[in-house]
């Protein structure tokens, strides 16, 4: 066809390769999940952490932690004590949930940067309800359908739907970010679009109580009805997102939340020598 094609501009990729080759820092991120024996189950999250490391001039070591092993805070200290940040990705079903809640509590009480994605955000909310609001039985209706304090509940348009896969809130949806939040700082804008895959959401019946006890609603649907993200103020990074930011991260364009999370992990590391990391009560 004798088409004239312009020369390929590889400048951006050459700069990326240069950044990767000259990384001078290293941080350790504990990935707490139920499918950790098969790392590919979290491939997008894993790659997104690496992308964020590139932009922060850091290597990222991922420590794979089976949430079923985290039976109490002493176990958390043993498994998570050398981590510079803790991430809890998405998932379904009640297996390993209590261990994830233990991990979220450990992160909150020890000021370790925490990033909760989808289920990980719901875990963050349940932990806060149990240990800050005082609802010891706080849970999700996914796990305790008849629970009295289900701070995570089935979305209204999912009521009565029995099949999971084809009926979720799927795909890209807009989100309005609350000004002055860590989330706003990471994105640099107040209006974003992110990809979703869930049936359960933050239960607005408890929203006022959470806000009174200090939890910040960092992002909502444009009409304010759906809570899309929450965070604890005054922390370098303790944030949960109902959406899946890992689906939009790229090697040459790390997702803003992953970038902010790794930056916070590096800051935490710089402020804590190995002997300063939280230890178990027995040590």
Please annotate each region the language model reported.
Residues 1-236, 245-283:
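N-terminal beta1-alpha1 cap of cysteine-dependent amidohydrolase-like domains
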Residues 242:
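Active-site ExK catalytic segment of metal-dependent nucleases
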């Amino acid at each position: 066809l004798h088409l004239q094609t312009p020369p390929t501009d590889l400048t951006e990729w050459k700069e990326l390769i240069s950044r990767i080759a000259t990384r001078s820092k290293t941080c350790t991120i504990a990935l707490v999940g139920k499918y950790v024996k098969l790392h590919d189950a979290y491939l997008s999250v894993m790659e997104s952490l690496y992308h964020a490391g590139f932009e922060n001039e850091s290597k990222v070591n991922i420590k794979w932690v089976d949430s079923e092993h985290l039976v109490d805070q002493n176990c958390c200290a043993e498994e998570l004590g050398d981590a510079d940040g803790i991430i809890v990705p998405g998932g379904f079903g009640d297996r390993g949930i209590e261990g994830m809640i233990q991990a979220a509590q450990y992160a909150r009480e020890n000021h370790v940067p925490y990033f909760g994605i989808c289920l990980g955000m719901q875990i963050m909310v349940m932990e806060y309800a149990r240990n800050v609001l005082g609802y010891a039985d706080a849970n999700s209706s996914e796990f305790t359908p008849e629970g009295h304090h289900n701070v995570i509940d089935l979305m209204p348009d999912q009521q009565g739907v029995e099949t999971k896969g084809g009926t979720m809130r799927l795909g890209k949806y807009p989100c309005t970010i609350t000004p002055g939040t860590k989330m706003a700082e990471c994105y640099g804008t107040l209006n974003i679009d992110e990809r979703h895959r869930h049936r359960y959401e933050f239960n607005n019946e408890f929203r006022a109580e959470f806000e009174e006890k200090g939890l910040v609603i960092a992002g909502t649907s444009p009409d304010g009805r759906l809570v899309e993200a929450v965070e604890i103020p005054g922390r370098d990074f303790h944030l949960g997102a109902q959406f899946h930011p890992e689906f939009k991260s790229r090697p040459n364009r790390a997702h803003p939340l992953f970038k902010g999370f790794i930056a916070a992990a590096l800051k935490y590391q710089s402020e804590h020598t190995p002997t300063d990391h939280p230890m178990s009560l027995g040590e």
